[in-house]
Design a protein with these regions (language model features):
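Glycosyltransferase catalytic domains, chiefly GT-A lineage
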Residues: 2-377
Length: 377
């Protein structure tokens, strides 16, 4: 009798398991999913996370440069993943809770809205000191946990880059830096100006981003703006959205009252904001005009002509040469760098401020410059 009872129990267990299997089959079928597609998504998510673990290669060398793709958005070789390169300055972050919070907002928004194809990789470059690099390695896996795309992380030593950069930009520092001298430590703020000379030639294009951003759109769409560059353009950059350069060019404007220098859009030349930049490094390398403008004599001539004295580094340089050579720049729409700072509205330019600050169209990236709070989605 005991044997018969145990046998009946065994049969009941088998029948119950079979019933569960049938229910599960129809449940997943109703969701239009199957074992293969579900497994595929899991694997893709695991790959995107694993590429940033401690065992990943985080050397300062760029391991994945690719020749230019046909579409102009990523860099690829046949049979290899297409790579999209983005760079951020990540220095002294370990000593600033404010910078850490800004970084969290930026990277979480990239992960939230980022969408790439299966064979594409977002390569995240960080120019960093040792302490910030250590912190970044701890923060990034958590911040990118929700990313559905593959990514790689590359840290560049700020000291090594500065050593290469300083001889190239030393002469321009007195025109575009705070203070009256040249400061070795400040050279890194001109990285975008001469990145084409110190990065490997395999790196064709890169997007440089400030730390105080919040994406509301897919970062991949930003790379598509490279496709819209006119023939002579080497840099994509949005206009400055405050009357900063109306103020900076005051003397030139006084001497040239019919000039549009410093005037608001659409007809004026308001200058540029470097919070979001598309750098076509290949085009920068091959542009005779752009490289001539890096020569100390040409720089000094333009600075004298426009009575220019700035303190915003690369942004000032691009603004000044843009007054003379607009063809070198592709103006990004204000939605790709929706600056939020309103400092100049309260400091003498309230009557014209809105002419600069207005931004029609969708906002893809908020830029919380001058510590301005960024709206919640």
């Amino acid at each position: 009798m005991g044997r018969f009872s145990s046998f009946r129990s065994y049969q009941i267990v088998l029948l119950f398991a079979a019933a569960l299997a049938v229910v599960a089959f129809y449940y997943f079928g109703s969701e239009k999913q199957n074992f293969s597609s579900t497994t595929k998504r899991i694997k893709e998510t695991q790959v995107s996370h694993n590429t940033n673990r401690d065992d990943a290669d985080l050397s300062i060398d760029i391991r994945s440069g690719r020749p230019e793709s046909r579409t102009g958005d990523g860099e690829e070789l046949e049979g290899k993943p297409s790579r999209f390169h983005a760079l951020m300055m990540f220095t002294k972050v370990n000593k600033s809770l404010n910078l850490q919070q800004k970084f969290r907002v930026t990277m979480r928004s990239v992960a939230k809205h980022g969408r790439f194809l299966e064979d594409e990789v977002l390569v995240l470059h960080y120019v960093s000191d040792a302490g910030s690099q250590e912190l970044g390695k701890k923060m990034l896996p958590e911040l990118l946990l929700g990313a559905t795309f593959q990514y790689e992380v590359v840290f560049h030593d700020v000291g090594a880059l500065t050593e290469k950069l300083f001889p190239i930009i030393e002469a321009m520092q007195k025109h575009f830096s705070a203070g009256s001298g040249t400061y070795y430590s400040d050279a890194i703020f001109f990285l975008s100006v001469a990145m084409h000379r110190i990065m490997p030639t395999e790196l064709k294009r890169i997007v440089q981003l400030d730390l105080d951003l919040k994406f509301r759109s897919n970062i991949r769409d930003l790379f598509q703006e490279f496709n819209r560059f006119p023939a002579e353009a080497v840099i994509g950059i949005a206009h400055e959205m405050q009357p900063v350069y109306r103020h900076t060019f005051w003397q030139y404007r006084k001497e040239n009252p019919k000039s549009h220098v410093g005037d608001p859009p659409p007809d004026g030349l308001p200058g540029f904001n470097s919070g979001v930049m598309l750098l076509n490094l290949d085009a920068m390398r091959h542009s005779t005009l752009y490289n001539q403008l890096l020569e100390p004599e040409r720089m000094a001539h333009l600075a004298e002509k426009y009575h220019f004295r700035g303190h915003l580094g690369d942004q000032d340089f691009f603004t000044m040469i843009g007054m003379e050579h607009r063809e070198l720049f592709y103006p990004l729409s204000c939605g790709w760098n929706r600056q939020l700072c309103t400092w100049w509205r309260e400091h003498g330019y309230g009557d014209v401020f809105q002419l600069y600050y207005r931004c029609d169209g969708p906002v893809h990236i908020y830029h919380g410059n001058c510590n301005t709070p960024i709206p919640n989605d």
